[in-house]
């Protein structure tokens, strides 16, 4: 499941609220005409070689194109990601995200962030939306 993989790789070290927020960003993108209209296409969005493999560091979510294995190693964390993904897909969402379509960790300061509206910081992630 694409959404669960994204939660696992992007936020498994975050509290539940942070994991839900990462999932909600994907769903918000699906509902935004600037992005693909399904979860897997949003998660795997980026530049790809003709072979279909992602180009290193040229995708929306860093885990997908960092050159490392995308296999899950922590089964308990992956199962929890699956649970969160299912709940978010079934419509569980939280108003505190206010349409967030972007986030990054507190360890980086991407140039795109200055053009977005800050919404909230949840643990190690900062969330934004188009302004």
Language-model features, listed with the residues they occupy:
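Bacterial extracytoplasmic/cell-wall-associated proteins, especially those involved in peptidoglycan
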Residues: 1-131
């Amino acid at each position: 499941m694409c959404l669960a993989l994204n939660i696992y790789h992007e936020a498994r070290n975050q509290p539940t609220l942070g994991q839900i927020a990462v999932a909600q960003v994907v769903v918000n993108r699906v509902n935004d005409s600037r992005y693909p209209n399904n979860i897997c296409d949003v998660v795997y969005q980026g530049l790809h070689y003709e072979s279909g493999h992602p180009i290193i560091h040229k995708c929306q979510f860093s885990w997908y194109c960092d050159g490392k294995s995308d296999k899950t190693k922590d089964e308990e964390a992956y199962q929890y990601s699956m649970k969160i993904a299912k709940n978010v897909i079934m419509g569980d969402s939280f108003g505190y995200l206010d349409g967030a379509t972007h986030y990054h960790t507190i360890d980086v300061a991407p140039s795109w962030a200055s053009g977005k509206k800050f919404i909230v910081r949840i643990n190690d992630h900062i969330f934004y939306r188009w302004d």
